[in-house]
Amino acid sequence: MDKRANSRKPFLFYNEDYYCEKPKRYFHTNKVIFEKLDSYATNINRCRELLTDFFDYCLPKYYRRKNKFTLLFRLLEPVIKQAGASALTTVSNDQCRWLEINQFSGWEQRDNQYAHKWLIKVVGADMGQQILFIIKQVTKKFKTCNLGFHNYYKLFRRCLSILLFKHKEVFVQCLQVILKAAMPVKKKGVVKSNYAFAVTNALHYYIVDNPHLLCKDINVAIKVRRLLIKHEMLPTEKQIKLSFEKCSKGIEVPLYEKLLLNHMMRINDDNLQWPSLINNKKIMEWNANRCFDESNKILHVYIGQYYTSSCRRVKKSFFKYNGWNRQGRFCRTEKFCHLVNLQLNKDGSKKLKRVQRKLINCK
């Protein structure tokens, strides 16, 4: 029999004669209230312990345990709001489609401040270091938390977008931590696990959806491309290259004039004398149309088109079903009585109470 990919056995693998008639019980958990635990957070070690337990609760370290990823946004909400209203408005309207930070009620926003206070004691008041700490905690649980593509994309959309405006160096560090955990250099671009495939797809799709994020700073774009080449994420690097080529096509403006104009617009000093670029119609036209047109961009591609053709993925061998065996299988499609498990007596012996089975007619 071939090896299976996970612990679930395929259809008709079991040959059960009995089953338990008791219904499944689902235990409901109460809401997380940080205020109740604030009295315990008296020093840095206890704050770190509370944050570790919270990450274990949101992203369990046990295989196939249900995760509570949405609770992680309660810790992210006060961290992201430190950037200020103007930066959040720019990120939400211009750079990213949704930040979704105002989805909590009033008491939840007040309660989130307690967890943020613990995070400040452990990491510090710097917003970039706080987001880096959260990214590191999530990457430690990549193998077991089983989040999936959409949850990783939501996390990158909230954390990485705001870092490009406030902490560009921390953005590169976060990207390096993610690539080191999901796509190590020693694997040479081969994706062997489902979690790595989900993380790399989410990161690729995030960059492809928002290529203009990297165009705010050419140094960040160069570092990102070097990281992607180093970790063999060549389809994503190819899209960044296409975005730069598209920006320069149509208007033949030298790179020196582009960089000079960007540098002049950053510095507001009337005493400095710069060469006049206003009379150059090409540079003025490029400045007016240098933003990317998201509706007509060629960068909006599906992940499968690139990772299926460019990224090597090791296929797992699953159980092969060879058809219905009439001699060794039982019919479960007709009406039957309730079957019960074997009864275990106090002396250790087992007694079969009642079993009904129906063999299929071979004719």
From Swiss-Prot:
Any Pfam family: DUF5509
Domain of life: Viruses
Protein name, per record: 43 kDa protein
Organism the protein comes from: Autographa californica nuclear polyhedrosis virus (AcMNPV)
Species lineage: Viruses, Viruses incertae sedis, Naldaviricetes, Lefavirales, Baculoviridae
Gene: P43
